[in-house]
């Protein structure tokens, strides 16, 4: 008979599966509480790293339609429920597993597809979403910047051919007539003060 506590736990795990775009199943045998806390901090706020009961997790996974963990729920199990950037979370997990051999990445899923441990490592090797977006923005911006440079080069070439002063020389040329106007006004003012 299911107790209210177990029913609540299954509902919470089911909800975690449904809200996550990815999850990674790990075995944490031998990790200290301090190490688990360090791992949770490195994963960030968009990833929930939860120690789970295997039987309850199997029920919750079935209810959520996640088949990636079939046959993998054995031993001390913890799951990283990833709601944000799956690449960054997978990278944090694999980096932590490299320095803490007690954490074993068993399997995972990403956007409904089951992943084995090597595929989780391959996901971690991808560039982060922010870096990918920055590259796309750079690619989109490059043609406009190149066009602006070409237009500016053509303008400079035309100015040289026509003998017009370059844009940098234009302000100096404009200042000269203003200085001449000031000189012509100064003698007129001097003459007016002499007459008085």
Swiss-Prot record:
Gene that specifies this protein: rplJ
- Coiled-coil segments, which residues? none
A single BP term in Gene Ontology? translation
Task: Determine the domain of life of the protein's source.
Answer: Bacteria
Q: Which HAMAP family match?
A: Ribosomal_uL10
Entry keyword set: Ribonucleoprotein, Ribosomal protein, RNA-binding, rRNA-binding
Gene Ontology cellular component list = large ribosomal subunit
Q: What is this protein called?
A: Large ribosomal subunit protein uL10
């Amino acid at each position: 008979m299911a107790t209210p506590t177990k029913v609540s736990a299954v509902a919470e795990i089911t909800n975690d599966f449904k809200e996550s775009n990815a999850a990674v199943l790990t075995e944490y045998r031998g990790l200290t509480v301090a190490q688990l806390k360090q791992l949770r901090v490195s994963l960030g706020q968009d990833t929930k790293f939860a120690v789970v009961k295997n039987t309850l997790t199997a029920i919750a996974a079935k209810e959520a339609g996640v088949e990636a963990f079939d046959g993998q729920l054995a031993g001390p199990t913890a799951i990283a429920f990833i709601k944000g950037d799956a690449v960054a979370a997978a990278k944090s997990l694999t980096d932590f597993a490299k320095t803490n051999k007690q954490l074993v990445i068993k399997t995972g899923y990403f956007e409904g597809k089951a992943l084995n441990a090597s595929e989780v490592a391959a996901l971690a090797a991808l560039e982060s979403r922010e870096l990918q977006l920055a590259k796309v923005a750079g690619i989109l911006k490059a043609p406009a910047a190149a066009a602006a440079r070409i237009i500016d080069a053509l303008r400079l070439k035309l100015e040289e051919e026509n003998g017009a002063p370059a844009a940098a020389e234009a302000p100096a040329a404009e200042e000269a007539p203003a200085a001449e106007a000031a000189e012509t006004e100064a003698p007129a003012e001097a003459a007016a003060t002499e007459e008085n």
